[in-house]
Amino acid sequence: MQLKAFSVSEVTEYIKKVMDNDIILRNVRVRGEISNLKYHSTAVYFTLKDEGAALKCVMFNDYSRSLEFTLQDGMSVIATGRITVYEKGGLYQLYVQSVQMDGIGALYIAFNKLKEKLQKEGLFDLDKKKPIPKHPRKIAVVTSPTGAVIRDIITISRRRNPTVDIMVVPVLVQGSSAADEISNALRILNKRKDIDVIIVARGGGSLEEIWPFNEEKVARSIFASRIPVVSAVGHETDFTIADFVADLRAPTPSAAAELVVPDIKVYQRELFLLKTKIMNLMKAQVLHSKKEFEGLKRALYLNNPIKKNEVLKQRVKNLKKSLTKEMLSIFNQKKNELLVLNEKLDSLSPLKVLTRGYTIVLNKEGQVITSSRKVKTSEEVGILFSDGRATAVVKEVKEDGERI
């Protein structure tokens, strides 16, 4: 008996009916590693593989938009959907309706692989961290517009310094679109000139929920930002790739507000100390200037020509008085000395002897004849008396012992 020959379409249609009616294949969960991941306008195409086989998969956008994370090659996942035949290609494939990561271990593997990659590229280097401004005027907060995170940041910021402007940039913080929204927000903010610092924040959650902050595109957007970025994701013990790339990591969103927004009380205290310092400097300067002024005033007074003239006049007067007194003293002293000398001279004067009856004999030259040997006979001599003189002629000269 000859078997009936079926057309390709008939066989394919039969296989499709069998698979579509299979209770297991209509709703099946398949574990495998993603490969050959491709995004198209209407769907995401990839292959699930393990050590022994491979399964083509397609996930239409209506389903992929609800993903809590972004699909990546090498990621271990569990895909849920229905397996049927794609008739035109003659292929059976899994039409995926949902995808979940295959355990926390797979996420940690992906986390560590990306961390190692970015670290080798230098995205975590400390010397590439930008300093957080000490006195920001405007802070952009990239986070969900609702919930405790943004409320806490705004409350703490207003309490610490109400003059700081907080700009809320609303984005999804979980789901497959979150990474794109966060990256776009950072790119747009970097076009502005009025933003001093950016806080990227979300509250705590599971590793799957905070996974957008472990996405490579978010990490690279943070690194490329010219504006300093502070990451504040999850709880204190949660670490994301964003934390390593950011210029500063805050343990919580509330802590980010504490770290970035300066306390106005500190401003006021610093202002008071600065004011006190300025006042002390001014007082010291005034005191110094006053001393200098007094010194200049005194110097001007002493160097004043009129004052100098008065001083000189007084000095001349004092010198004149002193000189007169000194001269009078010297005059009296010399006068007394002269009187004493005069008395001595008078007592020794030959004329004084004449008053006692003696005479002095003089030769023609008026010289005193002190010896008989100095006179000759017939020589004319002068005789000096106390009250006059006379002329005589020597008649005879005798030596001592001879009588005249």
UniProtKB/Swiss-Prot annotation:
CDD domains: ExoVII_LU_OBF
The entry's keywords: Cytoplasm, Exonuclease, Hydrolase, Nuclease
One GO location term (cellular component): exodeoxyribonuclease VII complex
Sample GO molecular function, one term: nucleic acid binding
Class of enzymatic activity (EC top level): hydrolase
UniProt main location, coarse: cytoplasm
GO terms for biological process, alphabetical: DNA catabolic process
The reaction(s) this protein catalyses: Exonucleolytic cleavage in either 5'- to 3'- or 3'- to 5'-direction to yield nucleoside 5'-phosphates
Keyword Zinc in annotation: no
HAMAP family listed in its UniProt record: Exonuc_7_L
Family per similarity comment: Belongs to the XseA family.
Biological function: Bidirectionally degrades single-stranded DNA into large acid-insoluble oligonucleotides, which are then degraded further into small acid-soluble oligonucleotides.
Protein name as catalogued: Exodeoxyribonuclease 7 large subunit
Natural source organism: Caldanaerobacter subterraneus subsp. tengcongensis (strain DSM 15242 / JCM 11007 / NBRC 100824 / MB4)
